């Protein structure tokens, strides 16, 4: 199965790109087109490590393929450097939506950290408005091209700063203006969700949806804190939940597992796992199990009934698309179209939308896979 970032792949004779998809874990600053980075940097006089788009892509790859989350995150200094003005944010957001639509995404949630985009003099509110303007322009452009897509914002607070309560209030203020949820991200080690209890208390009081990056670089304690302190409705990555499972026997496709209390809670409550297999490989998130895609516990979690979803994390950093991620999983674990559909249904059910709109997404996915 030929797989590339922007191309297509076929499964059982069907174009994967043509199928309706839901994208829940998609970073705006991880998805800026390299040629856009180069152009915006040139216009703004921003110094880049490489000025040619292809060379810049290679430079980013060197950092993101390191096997360490901390090194992986350094590439974001480049993308955020050209996301500091209203015009820059609007363009990047518009192109992001266009790229999702081209990828066959019908509903997406884009996460980004407003506190990292104030260098051009914008207020937090102005930054959110700029991104929303770009999203709406992208949705309109996609509709003109015959592709219907809806995208909501997830406002991210950085776990190593003290701005989480401020960002939480910002998210709630914009809940009727394009923002659908709150996220906590950044280096996990040393910065547990418990440091941000005031923000999470406020969000709980406001009945506002929360997802938390957890179980990526850190272990099950980070997931425990995301659930207990963050009251997360979804887990950003969450792959380390598999460390709370003990495989006691295997026979063919059958596996016998002993569940820890945390893993059983996540599975039984159908808490969506926002898994991103390419990114997890790049950052070393699957190191406890190995270094190859086939070592990823995705399939184990899926077979055990966890609410697994498939995501890109960072399109530019991982040089990927949702089509590509699905193709990789299908090739690695011998999945068929029924499995691909299940991943989309899990994502639709976990979207930060009213139940009626989630049901509409489920119907769109079901109809799109009725081939």
Language-model features: where?
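Metal-cofactor-binding active-site regions of metalloenzymes
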Residues: 1-208, 216-234, 240-371
């Amino acid at each position: 199965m030929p797989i590339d970032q922007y191309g297509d792949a076929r499964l059982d004779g069907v174009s994967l790109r043509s199928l309706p998809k839901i994208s829940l874990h998609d970073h705006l600053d991880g998805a800026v087109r390299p040629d856009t980075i180069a152009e915006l940097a040139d216009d703004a006089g921003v110094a880049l490590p490489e000025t040619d788009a292809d060379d810049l892509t290679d430079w980013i790859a060197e950092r993101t393929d390191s096997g360490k989350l901390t090194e992986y995150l350094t590439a974001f200094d480049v993308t955020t450097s050209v996301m500091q003005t209203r015009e820059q944010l609007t363009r990047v957001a518009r192109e992001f939506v266009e790229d999702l639509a081209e990828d066959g995404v019908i509903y997406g949630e884009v996460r980004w950290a407003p506190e990292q985009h104030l260098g051009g003099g914008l207020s937090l509110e102005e930054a959110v408005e700029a991104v929303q303007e770009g999203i709406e322009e992208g949705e309109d452009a996609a509709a003109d091209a015959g592709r219907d897509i809806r995208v909501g914002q997830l406002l991210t607070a950085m776990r190593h700063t003290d701005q989480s309560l401020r960002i939480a209030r910002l998210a709630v203020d914009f809940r009727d203006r394009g923002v659908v949820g709150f996220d906590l991200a950044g280096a996990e080690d040393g910065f547990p969700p418990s440091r941000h209890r005031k923000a999470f208390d406020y969000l709980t009081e406001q009945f506002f949806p929360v997802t938390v990056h957890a179980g990526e670089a850190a272990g099950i304690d980070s997931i425990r804190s995301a659930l207990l302190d963050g009251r997360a409705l979804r887990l950003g990555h969450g792959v380390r939940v598999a460390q709370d499972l003990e495989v006691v026997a295997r026979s063919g496709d059958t596996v016998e597992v002993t569940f820890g209390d945390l893993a059983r809670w996540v599975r039984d409550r159908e808490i969506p796992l926002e898994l991103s297999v390419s990114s997890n490989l790049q950052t070393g998130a699957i190191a406890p199990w190995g270094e190859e895609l086939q070592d990823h516990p995705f399939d184990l979690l899926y077979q055990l009934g966890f609410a697994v979803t498939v995501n890109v994390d960072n399109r530019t950093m991982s040089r990927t698309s949702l089509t590509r991620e699905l193709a990789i999983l299908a090739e690695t674990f011998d999945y068929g179209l029924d499995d691909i559909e299940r991943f989309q249904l899990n994502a639709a059910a976990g979207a930060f939308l009213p139940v009626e709109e989630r049901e509409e997404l489920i119907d769109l996915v079901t109809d799109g896979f009725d081939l």
